[in-house]
């Protein structure tokens, strides 16, 4: 939870007056109303978060809770509801079920022509009583997964296509912090392709909090391979040299693996035999999270 809180702070670092704190298994983010929308957009991309709920933070006094619940429900359009209460602070005089029933009465008195539905309500008013009380009704799904960095770091071989950033996203979701590695071989790869990779790196940074990108000049080596090697071996040799260079970067950065966007049989160079030959050039494990997917699934 410490790492997750740190990742949330990183995601919100550009916003002012943000405070991230841990409260009994929850992470509470105090944020100005003016920054709420942007803050939510950033938080719901942080891996390790299951859900986010914008909440009113109030005193743990019954009359304050009642008034807050009433103010919350009056503007809303609903016909069925329930109140879910959780009393984490055992000094509060009412137990959870008793508080839920009491606040249900508050809602019934505040809004006409509504009924209680405990199983499938249109509105679920949630109240958590701790040292302070949180009142909310909206739950926004997060990406889930593990906090980025808890599983170590991986070298992500970026190409400019959709496959490699999706692979990086998937490994980040399992707690690996990706470090981008892009091989630029002008004129075989254009400057526009490099700009696209930089753009993809920025998008990934929105999920990982930060993203270091290595741009490796590869033209000279690629020309040597093309000039001196049999044509049918060129692609495999290029991939083997990329793997070796990526391993050198991995040693410098303390990476525990390499990640690629390869998918079995998607192109001629991605057969079992070709992947085996590429693997033999690397000592680190090569992770291929897209290996069993086709292009439609990846997109």
Give the residues covered by each predicted segment.
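RNA-binding accessory domains that recognize and position tRNA/RNA substrates
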Residues: 1-155, 165-211
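Membrane-targeting and insertion segments and their boundary/processing signals
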Residues: 39, 43, 167-171, 216, ...
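Hydrophobic/aromatic beta-strand patches that form the interior of the parallel beta-sheet core
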Residues: 125, 179-181, 214-216, 259, ...
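Proteins with a high burden of low-complexity, intrinsically disordered sequence enriched in S/T/G/P/A and R
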Residues: 1, 64-66, 71-72, 267-271, ...
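A conserved beta-strand->alpha-helix junction
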Residues: 201-228
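Active-site adenylate/phosphate-handling loop in enzymes that bind or generate adenylated species
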Residues: 102-107, 113, 143-151, 218, ...
């Amino acid at each position: 939870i410490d790492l997750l809180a740190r990742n949330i702070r990183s995601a919100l670092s550009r916003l002012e007056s943000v405070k991230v704190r841990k409260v009994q298994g929850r992470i509470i983010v105090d944020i100005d109303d003016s920054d709420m929308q942007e803050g939510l957009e950033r938080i719901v991309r942080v891996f390790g978060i299951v859900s986010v709920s914008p909440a009113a933070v109030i005193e743990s006094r019954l009359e304050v809770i009642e008034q807050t619940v009433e103010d919350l429900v009056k503007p809303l359009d609903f016909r069925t509801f329930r109140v879910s209460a959780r009393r984490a602070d055992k000094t509060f005089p009412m137990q959870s079920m008793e508080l839920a029933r009491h606040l249900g009465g508050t809602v019934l008195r505040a809004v006409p022509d509504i009924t209680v539905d405990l199983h499938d309500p249109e509105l679920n008013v949630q109240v958590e009583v701790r040292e302070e009380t949180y009142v909310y009704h909206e739950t926004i799904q997060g990406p889930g997964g593990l906090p980025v960095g808890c599983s170590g770091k991986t070298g992500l071989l970026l190409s400019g296509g959709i496959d490699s950033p999706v692979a990086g996203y998937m490994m980040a979701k399992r707690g690996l912090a990706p470090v981008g590695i892009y091989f630029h071989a002008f004129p075989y790869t254009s400057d526009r392709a490099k700009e696209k990779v930089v753009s993809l790196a920025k998008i990934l940074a929105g999920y990982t909090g930060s993203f270091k990108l290595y741009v490796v000049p590869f033209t000279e080596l690629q020309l040597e391979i093309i000039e001196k090697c049999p044509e049918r071996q060129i692609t495999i040799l290029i991939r083997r040299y990329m793997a070796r260079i990526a391993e050198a970067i991995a040693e410098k950065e303390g990476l525990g693996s390499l990640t690629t966007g390869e998918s079995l049989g998607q192109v001629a160079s991605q057969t079992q035999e070709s992947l085996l030959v590429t693997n033999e050039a690397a000592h680190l494990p090569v992770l291929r999270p897209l290996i069993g997917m086709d292009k439609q699934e990846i997109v």
